[in-house]
Amino acid sequence: PPAIASRLGLAPGVRLLHLVCLHLADGRPALIEDRWLNPAVLPQKPDFHRQSANEWLLAHVPYTTGDIGFSAANATAEEARLLEVPQGAALFVLDRTTWEGDRPVTCVRLAHTPGYRMQTLI
Protein backbone atom coordinates (compact mmCIF):
# COMPACT_ATOMS: atom_id res chain seq x y z
CA PRO A 1 0.00 0.00 0.00
CA PRO A 2 1.19 3.55 -0.75
CA ALA A 3 1.11 4.62 2.93
CA ILE A 4 3.39 1.73 3.91
CA ALA A 5 5.77 2.36 1.01
CA SER A 6 5.93 6.02 2.03
CA ARG A 7 6.61 5.12 5.66
CA LEU A 8 9.50 2.92 4.49
CA GLY A 9 10.74 5.52 2.01
CA LEU A 10 10.12 3.18 -0.92
CA ALA A 11 8.45 3.80 -4.26
CA PRO A 12 4.78 2.80 -4.52
CA GLY A 13 4.41 -0.66 -6.01
CA VAL A 14 7.61 -2.08 -4.50
CA ARG A 15 7.00 -5.69 -3.47
CA LEU A 16 6.80 -6.15 0.30
CA LEU A 17 6.05 -9.12 2.54
CA HIS A 18 3.01 -8.74 4.79
CA LEU A 19 2.47 -10.68 7.99
CA VAL A 20 -0.41 -10.44 10.46
CA CYS A 21 -0.12 -12.46 13.68
CA LEU A 22 -2.17 -12.81 16.81
CA HIS A 23 0.03 -13.18 19.90
CA LEU A 24 -1.32 -14.97 22.96
CA ALA A 25 -0.42 -14.62 26.64
CA ASP A 26 -1.56 -17.39 28.97
CA GLY A 27 -3.73 -18.69 26.12
CA ARG A 28 -5.60 -15.39 25.69
CA PRO A 29 -5.28 -12.83 22.87
CA ALA A 30 -2.69 -10.20 23.84
CA LEU A 31 -1.77 -8.28 20.70
CA ILE A 32 -2.08 -8.12 16.94
CA GLU A 33 1.16 -7.74 15.00
CA ASP A 34 0.68 -6.18 11.55
CA ARG A 35 4.14 -6.21 9.95
CA TRP A 36 5.52 -5.23 6.54
CA LEU A 37 8.99 -6.46 5.54
CA ASN A 38 11.30 -5.24 2.80
CA PRO A 39 12.45 -8.48 1.08
CA ALA A 40 15.37 -6.64 -0.55
CA VAL A 41 17.23 -6.61 2.80
CA LEU A 42 16.44 -10.16 3.91
CA PRO A 43 19.38 -12.57 3.53
CA GLN A 44 17.04 -15.55 3.03
CA LYS A 45 13.37 -16.40 2.93
CA PRO A 46 12.09 -16.19 6.51
CA ASP A 47 10.39 -19.14 8.19
CA PHE A 48 7.89 -17.72 10.65
CA HIS A 49 6.41 -21.12 11.48
CA ARG A 50 9.22 -21.80 13.95
CA GLN A 51 10.14 -18.30 15.10
CA SER A 52 8.35 -14.99 15.47
CA ALA A 53 9.11 -12.27 12.93
CA ASN A 54 10.79 -10.14 15.59
CA GLU A 55 13.02 -13.02 16.77
CA TRP A 56 13.91 -13.94 13.18
CA LEU A 57 14.77 -10.35 12.27
CA LEU A 58 16.97 -9.89 15.36
CA ALA A 59 18.88 -13.07 14.45
CA HIS A 60 19.24 -12.39 10.70
CA VAL A 61 18.95 -8.67 9.91
CA PRO A 62 20.77 -6.19 12.12
CA TYR A 63 19.22 -2.77 12.34
CA THR A 64 21.03 0.49 12.96
CA THR A 65 18.19 2.90 13.66
CA GLY A 66 14.48 3.06 14.11
CA ASP A 67 11.58 5.12 15.29
CA ILE A 68 8.77 4.26 17.66
CA GLY A 69 5.41 5.93 18.15
CA PHE A 70 2.95 5.26 20.96
CA SER A 71 -0.77 5.98 20.76
CA ALA A 72 -4.23 4.79 21.65
CA ALA A 73 -6.74 3.65 19.05
CA ASN A 74 -10.26 2.29 19.13
CA ALA A 75 -10.50 -1.37 18.15
CA THR A 76 -11.87 -1.92 14.66
CA ALA A 77 -14.41 -4.69 14.14
CA GLU A 78 -11.64 -7.07 13.01
CA GLU A 79 -9.30 -6.14 15.89
CA ALA A 80 -12.16 -6.57 18.37
CA ARG A 81 -12.95 -10.01 16.95
CA LEU A 82 -9.32 -11.18 17.11
CA LEU A 83 -8.58 -9.69 20.53
CA GLU A 84 -11.97 -10.72 21.95
CA VAL A 85 -12.79 -7.18 23.13
CA PRO A 86 -15.71 -4.87 22.34
CA GLN A 87 -15.52 -2.93 19.09
CA GLY A 88 -14.27 0.56 19.92
CA ALA A 89 -12.31 -0.61 23.00
CA ALA A 90 -9.19 1.47 23.66
CA LEU A 91 -6.05 -0.33 22.46
CA PHE A 92 -2.45 0.61 23.23
CA VAL A 93 -0.71 0.87 19.85
CA LEU A 94 3.01 0.87 19.12
CA ASP A 95 4.18 1.77 15.59
CA ARG A 96 7.83 1.00 14.83
CA THR A 97 10.00 1.31 11.72
CA THR A 98 13.59 0.04 11.55
CA TRP A 99 16.44 0.56 9.08
CA GLU A 100 19.78 -1.03 8.37
CA GLY A 101 21.82 1.99 7.30
CA ASP A 102 19.67 3.76 4.72
CA ARG A 103 17.74 0.60 3.82
CA PRO A 104 14.32 0.10 5.40
CA VAL A 105 13.90 -3.28 7.07
CA THR A 106 10.40 -3.39 8.51
CA CYS A 107 7.49 -1.42 9.84
CA VAL A 108 5.10 -2.90 12.34
CA ARG A 109 1.93 -1.95 14.18
CA LEU A 110 1.40 -3.72 17.49
CA ALA A 111 -2.13 -3.31 18.86
CA HIS A 112 -2.34 -4.44 22.49
CA THR A 113 -5.46 -5.39 24.44
CA PRO A 114 -7.01 -2.89 26.86
CA GLY A 115 -5.08 -2.61 30.11
CA TYR A 116 -1.67 -3.28 28.55
CA ARG A 117 1.05 -1.27 30.24
CA MET A 118 4.56 -0.60 28.99
CA GLN A 119 7.34 0.34 31.35
CA THR A 120 10.91 1.24 30.49
CA LEU A 121 14.05 2.56 32.16
CA ILE A 122 15.70 5.80 31.14
Model-derived features: positions:
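C-terminal all-alpha effector/ligand-binding and dimerization domain
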Residues: 1-122
